[in-house]
Structures are given as structure tokens and as C-alpha cells.
Amino acid sequence: MSYVGLHVHTHYSLFDGVATPEEYIDRAVELGMPALAITDHGTLSGHRELYRIAKAKSVKPILGLEGYMCADISDKRDKSEREGQQDLVYNHIILLAKNQKGLENLNKISEIAWTDGFFRKPRFDFAILEKYKEGIIVTSACPSSVLVKALEEQEFALAKKHLKWFKDTFGSDYYIEVMPHNAPEINKYLIELADEFEIKVVVTPDCHHVDTSQKEVQEFKLLLNTHAKVQKDITYAKSAKHSSMMDRLDYLYGKDRDITFNKFDIHLLSYDEIKGAMEKQGIDREDIYSNTLLLADTVEDYDIKDGLDLLPVQYKNPDQELANLTLASLEEKKLNSNWLGNDIYEQRLDEELSIIRDKKFAPYFLVVQNMINWAKKEDILVGPGRGSSAGSLVCYLLGITDIDPLEHGLLFFRFINPERNDFPDIDTDIQDTRRDEVKDYLVRQYRHVASIATFLQFKDKGVVRDVARVLDIPLTDVNK
């Protein structure tokens, strides 16, 4: 027997997840899971990576989100100002894309959450969820959900009100989650309500790391993120220095600290592990496992576009357009006395255009050139060139950079290597006070435009300093 992990946080859940999508997929293969969901907090950033890896390893990807739900996204008051409405501030809820339409709606919900709904966290409300419900599967989520919060306060009428809304809105695509780390009485209430409302129950591990080997790293990241304070007047006894890492953290921050993962098994549990944990709570129902498989079976494949497929099509033959522009520019620059020799430039241009043509990158160069030409025409300051793109003669001839790569001995292969399968990255410095004008132009010109986030990883020296801070080791000792 197996089940499917439907509540999974990767390292894209910043400071709240440790494992990579690949580590989770490898674990799913090891456990015999036919499918696996990704439900990072407030972000869809891990979707493409998990999808690609899951498909390569014959695991069905289920793309989702653990979102933050509120009563009204226009209400941006602090909790202290809400007078008893605190249960409707940042409520967790799991959304899973059932099909391509569901994935499109999931993206739309996320977009609204990060723009109109953002208040410390990306939020959406009941009205938005109802508007974009098509193709969405909803599960009730963790102890921070509206449902569990109501049960914890013994507000049973409120819990039933929420359940009725979700069932009326999503029908059979709404599921109630039970978890091994829920309080036993909460799981009991959830199952009773599910039976009363004829809603299917699924068991979920609410994973934040892939296995127990990552538990210490998870706790370190949590302490960093919550800016935990060492207990006052504590002295670091010699005996504590030789204890386990988790014991040392308990010693420094207290076993009963408000936020900790140390008390829970929140890794991707095997079927036997999760079944054993639920049986300890007196829950022995096979349907909570089989329902995860049934849910996964309802999920259809998605049409995930590759990077090149997303580029706008404005030319019937972008390769020819790029060749025409660069050759015309080369002819114009032949009058410059600094040229090393026309044959050298023509040979280099042929080589670059050939690689760009083989890689199908021409539309990207044309888009960047169009953007920079417009900015310069509007007297917006643009940098002369930065990064590896300065090694491209094509970029120079298009006016993307102002640096002659041959004159300075710069290599094109640092920019685009034909043996690598990555996408070129043209770094462009634009006058910061007028950058929004350029973005607005791109939207007008190409319609479908998105900002891109960059995820930075902990580096060696930074990791040492952060670990030392968590372990209350003076930086003077670290710097020795």
C-alpha cells in the first residue's frame, strides 16, 4: 500500500523548508509514491523545477500552493486592530491545480495575492478564490487554517459555516486534511465533520524536510527566521558543548520555545510511518490513505512551456532579422579606424549568429534591443554593458552594449556556450528613477510581462556566521 504526499514544502518556502524538489522526488521514488505535490508557502517558484524532475523520474507532479487566505484583501489592518476577527488574517489553505485551467487560475490567484492582496504576506480572500475556482482542488491545510483555528477555539458553528462554504464552492474537489502532528482531538473533530458533510479525508505529512537527516538544518533556519533569543542569564556549560545539536538548541532556547519543529516528524513519511503515527491517535481508517491516491488520479498533466516558448513572436524570421540588423551595423562601423580588420569581425559575427540560430535565441536579442533602443530614445540612462554579454559582438552591434569585445579580447563562449543548455542572461543597468517607465513600455509592447525573483543561497562564510549566531558563539571567536 502507498499514499501520495499532498502537502510538501521545498526550500522555496524560504526559511521554512530545507529539501530541494529533486530530493523530494527521489524520496517519493524510494517510497513508491506514484505522485507528489509541491505546496510552498505563498509562492509557485518551485513548480517548473519539480515538474521537470518529476516527469523525468516517472512521478506525477501535482502543482500547488499553501496560500494565505483572509476575509477581505482590502482590509490591511494589523491584528491588534481587528477586535475578534483575528481568525481571518493569514489563514493557511492548500490549492492544487487539477488541470491546465486550474494551473492558470492558480497563477492568477498568486498574482493577485502578491499585488492587490499583499500585506506582509501574499493574501487572497474568499471572493477571489470563488472567482478563480475552476480546475482547483482545495484541501483544508494545517493548524493555521480557518477550520482548525475554529475547532481549537471550540467554535463549532463557525467551523461548520466554513465547511459548508468550501463544499458548496468546490464540491467533490474539497478535501479535509488530517496530520500526524495535529492534536488527537483536532483530528477526531475533523473526521467527524468530514463524515457529517460527506467530505473525503486525506492524510498529509505537512513536510518541511525530506527525512530526519535534515531536521537540524530545518531547526537552524527556523531559529534564524524567527530571530529567536537565547534564554537570559544562561551559561554554556561544558557538558552542553558535547551534547547533540538538538539538545544544544533546547539548552539555549528552551525545550518549550514557542516555535519549533523539533517536536514533530514533518518529513516525507513512508506509508508505514504515517499509518503508525495515525494509529497511535486511534485513527485506523484506510480511506484517508486511498483518498490521496484518488485525488492524484483526478489530476491531469499540465502544458508547461519552456523558456523559449514564452518569448513573444513579432518576426516571421527572427534569425534573418537579427542577421540583417547586425550586418547593417557592421557595415556602418567599418568606417571606424579602430577596427582590427573586417575579416576578423565578419568571422566572429558568423560564429555568434550560427550559435544563436542553433539555440533559437534570436527573439531574445531582438526583445532586449527593442527595449534598450526605446529607453535611449526617451533619454533614459542605460549602462554600457555588464557581465558576460559584454563578450558578444552581436550585443555590441545591436547597441545592447557599448563595448567592442574584439578590441578588449572578450570571449563569446562565456556568454553562450554551445555545449551548455542554459539560457543567456543579458544584464542591463537602467536609470533607477525611470525603470518603471521601461517596464510599462514592455507591457504595452508585448502585453504578457512578468518580474523575476532571484533566490540567493547561503554561502560558506555566511553559513558559519549564522550557525555561530544560533549557537550563541561570539563572532570574535568565529573570526579567529
Predicted segment positions?
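A residue-level signal for conserved active-site and pocket-lining positions in enzyme catalytic cores
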Residues: 40, 61, 99, 138, ...
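Conserved short loop/turn motifs at secondary-structure junctions
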Residues: 38-44, 177-184, 209, 310-315, ...
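Extended substrate/RNA-proximal surfaces in nucleic-acid metabolism proteins
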Residues: 2-35, 41-197, 215-224, 231, ...
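Class I SAM-dependent methyltransferase SAM-binding "motif I" and its flanking Rossmann-like core
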Residues: 395-422
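Conserved phosphate/anionic-ligand binding catalytic regions in large, soluble enzymes, centered on
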Residues: 102, 141, 202-210, 380-402, ...
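A structural-propensity feature for long, helix-poor, extended segments
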Residues: 274, 278, 415-451
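Active-site or pore-adjacent capping/gating segments
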Residues: 217-323
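Non-catalytic structural connector segments
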Residues: 1-4, 147-148, 194-196, 276-386
